[in-house]
C-alpha cells in the first residue's frame, strides 16, 4: 500500500515518449525500472508508431552500433535523442564532455535532463560539477531539482556559490529551495 507517488523528485516519465515510437512496453520497463512502475498485461504490447521506424528492434539488434545511435542524435524527438545518448553511454561511445556539450546546446528539456543523469555515471567530477551548475539554472524545474540533489550528494565545495545563488535568486521554485536547504 501507499506505493504510488511516495517517492518525490523521481523522473517517472523518463523516455515515456518511446512508447509513441513503437517501443514495446516491456522494453520500456527494462530501461526505466522503478518501484512505482507496474506492468499489468502483455509486456509485448506496443502502440502504433507516430512515424515508421525500427526503433523497437534496433534497441536490441543495433545495441553497440555507435554510428547508428549518433545519427539519431539529430532526431526531432526528445526521447529518441535521449535513448541514443543512453545507448552511446552504455556502449562507451560518448564522453562526459560530449554529453555536457549536448546538454548545453539542446533546446529539449528532457534531453538536457538525460544528459545530466548520464554525466553522473562517468565519475568525472569536474564535468559533473559543470553540469550541475548549468542544471541549477535550467528553465526545466525537474532538472533544477535533480541538479540540487546531485549537488548536495557530491559535497563539492565549488558548488556552494551556485547553490547559494539558486536559493537566494530562484524564489519561484520552492521545491528546489527545499532541496538546497537539505
Regions found by a protein language model. Name each.
Residues 61-71, 92-104, 124-136, 156-168:
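Amphipathic alpha-helical scaffolding segments comprising HEAT/armadillo-like alpha-solenoid repeats
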Residues 28, 173-174:
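Membrane-interacting alpha-helical segments
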Residues 1-10:
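Short acidic/histidine-rich active-site segments
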Residues 17, 70-74, 82-86, 100-104, ...:
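Amphipathic alpha-helical repeat scaffolds
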Residues 29, 85, 97, 129, ...:
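Conserved positions within tetratricopeptide repeat
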Residues 12-94, 112:
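Caspase-like cysteine protease fold
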